[in-house]
Structures are given as structure tokens and as C-alpha cells.
A protein has these predicted regions:
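Non-heme di-metal
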Residues: 1-202
Length: 202
């Protein structure tokens, strides 16, 4: 059984360096992606799902920020030098700045909003899988239970979000009046829905 280490150990500080507060697959990117994609969704159910999950991702962003701050707020100058936190400290002290594990700042270039519900839902599903893999990789490096437990929770939520987006994709395609889902844009081509087809026949 692994003993629970204090949160100021070398190992924990190194983990704080790789937590995805602002990386391409981060909670920040997820929240902006979903809250932006929702506007072009043609069905209220889809708008609701993206709003709910996008809002939840903001809560997850706060969790990651809190973990990083708790791991670094009491570091001494020697610990900062020895534990790989110096570059970050020079720019931000122990403030929480949205950057990737590799150190580059968050950029919206890592997300996409196409305005096509089918495309955007696939984008969202892929984002959840990438976030899950990121958390899997963090868990491989982490022995601090104060970090592992919330990361496991966040990982589990990525799986749930993936499933909900999949359900929404099925809901959308079931309401379309053609089997070739790629022949039109359900957000732009309004008559592609079955109810519109029925109205046209009347």
C-alpha cells in the first residue's frame, strides 16, 4: 500500500506542472467550445445539453485551478528552483494562469465551432475522449490521493459527457428526413427535419 505523501513533495509539485488548466484539451477549452457551439443547435434539447455541460466544465476548471494553487502556494524559493516550477513562477508567481502542460498559453485555435450540429457534436465527443486520455496520463504520474481522487472524478465526468453527446447526435439524426446526414447542414438547411417535410406535404 502506498503511503499518502504530503502535498508539498517534489512529486506533487511536478504534477501541478502538467494539470490541464489551459491546454488544448483543458476544461477551459471545453467550456468555451460547448457554450459557443450551442447557439447553432437547431433543437432545444441540444442547446440544453451543451449549456449544461459547458457550465459544468467551468466548475471543473475551478477544481483544476484549486488543485494547482494548493500544490504550489506554500513553496519555498529552494523548492521552486529544485522542483521545476521556476519558469512558471517568474511569469505568474503562484497565480493560476491558463496554459498547457508544455507551458504555452491557452489559445482558441485549439477548439472549433463549425455551425454544423453534426460536425460540432462529433467535435465535442472527440474533445471528451481527448480529455479522458489526458486524465488517464496524469493518473499514471500521480501518487497523491488528494490529487488522484478529484482527477478520477473529472475523468468519470468526461465519459458521461461523451455518452450524452452521443445520445444528442442520435436524437438529431433521428429527426432528419434523409438518411444521408452529410448532404446538408441541419443548422442552416431548415427543411431537413421530418416535421418540416410533413408541413411541406400539407
Amino acid at each position: 500500500m502506498i503511503a499518502k505523501p504530503p502535498t508539498s513533495t517534489y512529486f506533487s509539485v511536478k504534477v501541478s506542472n502538467i494539470l490541464p488548466y489551459g491546454g488544448p484539451d483543458s476544461e477551459l477549452g471545453a467550456s468555451l467550445r460547448y457554450l459557443s457551439q450551442r447557439f447553432a443547435m437547431p433543437l432545444p434539447e441540444l442547446k440544453g445539453t451543451l449549456t449544461d455541460i459547458g457550465t459544468e466544465e467551468l466548475n471543473h476548471l475551478e477544481m483544476i485551478g484549486a488543485i494547482v494553487y494548493q500544490l504550489t502556494k506554500d513553496l519555498t524559493e529552494d523548492e521552486i528552483k529544485e522542483q521545476g516550477f521556476g519558469d512558471y513562477f517568474v511569469d505568474h508567481t503562484t497565480g493560476i494562469f491558463p496554459q498547457a502542460a508544455a507551458g504555452f498559453p491557452y489559445t482558441a485555435a485549439s477548439m472549433q465551432v463549425k455551425g454544423d450540429p453534426i460536425t460540432d457534436l462529433h467535435e465535442s465527443m472527440a474533445a471528451e475522449q481527448k480529455a479522458r486520455t489526458t486524465y488517464d496520463n496524469i493518473l499514471r504520474f500521480c501518487d497523491d490521493y488528494d490529487v488522484k481522487d478529484p482527477i478520477r472524478f473529472l475523468r468519470a465526468r468526461e465519459v458521461v459527457h461523451y455518452q450524452r453527446f452521443g445520445e444528442n447526435l442520435r436524437l438529431l439524426t433521428d429527426k432528419l428526413n434523409e438518411k444521408n446526414f452529410y448532404a446538408f447542414n441541419p443548422s442552416f438547411d431548415k427543411k431537413c427535419f421530418k416535421n418540416e417535410l410533413k408541413k411541406k406535404k400539407k
